[in-house]
Amino acid sequence: MRGDQKVIEQLNAALSSELTAIVQYMTQSEMCQNWGYKRLGDLTKGRAIEEMRHAEGLIERIIFLDGIPNIEVGLKPQLGSKVQEQLEIDLKDETDAVRQYNDAVKVCAEAKDDGSKSLFESMIRDEERHADFLDAQLHAIKEMGIANYLSQQLTGGK
Protein backbone atom coordinates (compact mmCIF):
# COMPACT_ATOMS: atom_id res chain seq x y z
CA MET A 1 0.00 0.00 0.00
CA ARG A 2 1.54 3.29 -1.05
CA GLY A 3 1.69 5.66 1.89
CA ASP A 4 1.88 9.43 2.21
CA GLN A 5 5.51 10.58 2.02
CA LYS A 6 5.13 13.00 4.94
CA VAL A 7 3.79 10.19 7.11
CA ILE A 8 6.67 7.91 6.11
CA GLU A 9 9.10 10.72 7.00
CA GLN A 10 7.48 11.00 10.44
CA LEU A 11 7.68 7.23 10.90
CA ASN A 12 11.37 7.22 9.94
CA ALA A 13 12.12 10.16 12.25
CA ALA A 14 10.44 8.27 15.08
CA LEU A 15 12.40 5.13 14.17
CA SER A 16 15.66 7.07 14.48
CA SER A 17 14.58 8.34 17.90
CA GLU A 18 13.60 4.86 19.06
CA LEU A 19 16.85 3.27 17.84
CA THR A 20 18.79 5.97 19.69
CA ALA A 21 16.77 5.30 22.84
CA ILE A 22 17.47 1.56 22.59
CA VAL A 23 21.23 2.11 22.43
CA GLN A 24 21.08 4.72 25.19
CA TYR A 25 18.94 2.68 27.59
CA MET A 26 20.80 -0.60 27.03
CA THR A 27 24.13 1.13 27.70
CA GLN A 28 22.76 2.92 30.77
CA SER A 29 21.33 -0.38 32.00
CA GLU A 30 24.73 -2.02 31.79
CA MET A 31 26.34 0.99 33.50
CA CYS A 32 23.86 0.71 36.38
CA GLN A 33 24.46 -3.04 36.63
CA ASN A 34 28.23 -2.41 36.71
CA TRP A 35 27.81 0.15 39.49
CA GLY A 36 25.82 -2.42 41.50
CA TYR A 37 22.39 -0.83 40.95
CA LYS A 38 20.71 -4.00 39.70
CA ARG A 39 17.14 -2.88 40.31
CA LEU A 40 17.54 0.34 38.33
CA GLY A 41 19.52 -1.47 35.63
CA ASP A 42 16.70 -3.99 35.21
CA LEU A 43 14.09 -1.22 34.99
CA THR A 44 16.16 0.66 32.41
CA LYS A 45 16.58 -2.51 30.36
CA GLY A 46 12.79 -2.95 30.47
CA ARG A 47 12.37 0.51 28.94
CA ALA A 48 14.87 -0.42 26.22
CA ILE A 49 12.84 -3.51 25.39
CA GLU A 50 9.67 -1.41 25.09
CA GLU A 51 11.52 0.92 22.71
CA MET A 52 12.53 -2.16 20.66
CA ARG A 53 8.85 -3.00 20.30
CA HIS A 54 8.18 0.56 19.15
CA ALA A 55 10.97 0.26 16.56
CA GLU A 56 9.52 -3.03 15.35
CA GLY A 57 6.07 -1.47 14.93
CA LEU A 58 7.52 1.50 13.07
CA ILE A 59 9.51 -0.73 10.71
CA GLU A 60 6.42 -2.84 10.02
CA ARG A 61 4.34 0.26 9.30
CA ILE A 62 6.96 1.87 7.04
CA ILE A 63 7.24 -1.32 4.99
CA PHE A 64 3.44 -1.67 4.85
CA LEU A 65 3.30 1.85 3.36
CA ASP A 66 5.92 0.85 0.75
CA GLY A 67 8.57 2.97 2.41
CA ILE A 68 12.14 2.05 3.25
CA PRO A 69 13.02 2.06 6.95
CA ASN A 70 15.99 4.23 7.83
CA ILE A 71 17.68 1.99 10.38
CA GLU A 72 20.62 4.25 11.15
CA VAL A 73 20.91 5.69 14.64
CA GLY A 74 20.77 9.28 13.48
CA LEU A 75 20.91 10.86 16.90
CA LYS A 76 23.79 10.57 19.36
CA PRO A 77 22.87 8.68 22.53
CA GLN A 78 23.41 10.73 25.69
CA LEU A 79 24.57 8.42 28.46
CA GLY A 80 25.28 10.51 31.55
CA SER A 81 28.11 9.65 33.93
CA LYS A 82 25.96 9.38 37.09
CA VAL A 83 22.53 7.96 37.83
CA GLN A 84 20.77 11.28 38.44
CA GLU A 85 22.21 12.72 35.23
CA GLN A 86 20.98 9.66 33.32
CA LEU A 87 17.48 10.07 34.72
CA GLU A 88 17.44 13.78 33.81
CA ILE A 89 18.63 13.08 30.26
CA ASP A 90 16.09 10.29 29.81
CA LEU A 91 13.23 12.45 31.12
CA LYS A 92 14.09 15.17 28.61
CA ASP A 93 14.28 12.60 25.81
CA GLU A 94 10.93 11.03 26.73
CA THR A 95 9.31 14.47 26.92
CA ASP A 96 10.78 15.34 23.51
CA ALA A 97 9.43 12.05 22.11
CA VAL A 98 5.92 12.85 23.34
CA ARG A 99 6.10 16.24 21.61
CA GLN A 100 7.52 14.69 18.41
CA TYR A 101 4.86 11.97 18.29
CA ASN A 102 2.03 14.43 18.97
CA ASP A 103 3.24 16.41 15.95
CA ALA A 104 3.32 13.17 13.94
CA VAL A 105 -0.29 12.43 14.92
CA LYS A 106 -1.30 15.73 13.28
CA VAL A 107 0.55 14.82 10.06
CA CYS A 108 -1.14 11.41 10.02
CA ALA A 109 -4.56 12.98 10.59
CA GLU A 110 -4.02 15.41 7.70
CA ALA A 111 -3.04 12.47 5.47
CA LYS A 112 -6.07 10.48 6.68
CA ASP A 113 -3.75 7.65 7.79
CA ASP A 114 -5.52 6.29 10.86
CA GLY A 115 -3.24 3.25 11.11
CA SER A 116 -0.10 5.34 11.53
CA LYS A 117 -1.97 7.79 13.75
CA SER A 118 -3.02 4.94 16.03
CA LEU A 119 0.57 3.66 16.22
CA PHE A 120 1.82 7.08 17.28
CA GLU A 121 -0.98 7.48 19.82
CA SER A 122 -0.05 4.17 21.41
CA MET A 123 3.61 5.17 21.53
CA ILE A 124 2.67 8.51 23.12
CA ARG A 125 0.96 6.68 25.99
CA ASP A 126 4.07 4.53 26.53
CA GLU A 127 6.43 7.52 26.43
CA GLU A 128 4.20 9.45 28.85
CA ARG A 129 4.36 6.49 31.23
CA HIS A 130 8.15 6.41 30.89
CA ALA A 131 8.36 10.16 31.56
CA ASP A 132 6.12 9.81 34.61
CA PHE A 133 8.35 7.04 36.00
CA LEU A 134 11.50 9.11 35.43
CA ASP A 135 9.92 12.19 36.99
CA ALA A 136 8.96 10.10 40.03
CA GLN A 137 12.55 8.84 40.36
CA LEU A 138 13.92 12.38 40.26
CA HIS A 139 11.32 13.45 42.82
CA ALA A 140 12.40 10.58 45.09
CA ILE A 141 16.03 11.68 44.78
CA LYS A 142 15.04 15.23 45.71
CA GLU A 143 13.04 14.05 48.72
CA MET A 144 15.37 11.39 50.15
CA GLY A 145 18.76 12.30 48.71
CA ILE A 146 20.82 10.48 46.13
CA ALA A 147 22.56 8.16 48.63
CA ASN A 148 19.27 6.84 50.04
CA TYR A 149 17.81 6.50 46.55
CA LEU A 150 20.81 4.55 45.29
CA SER A 151 20.79 2.26 48.30
CA GLN A 152 17.30 1.17 47.22
CA GLN A 153 18.60 0.30 43.74
CA LEU A 154 21.12 -2.28 44.96
CA THR A 155 18.80 -5.28 45.11
CA GLY A 156 17.33 -7.18 42.19
CA GLY A 157 13.70 -7.63 41.34
CA LYS A 158 11.08 -5.38 39.91
Predicted regions span which residues?
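Iron-associated oxidoreductase/ferritin-like identity signal
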Residues: 1-158
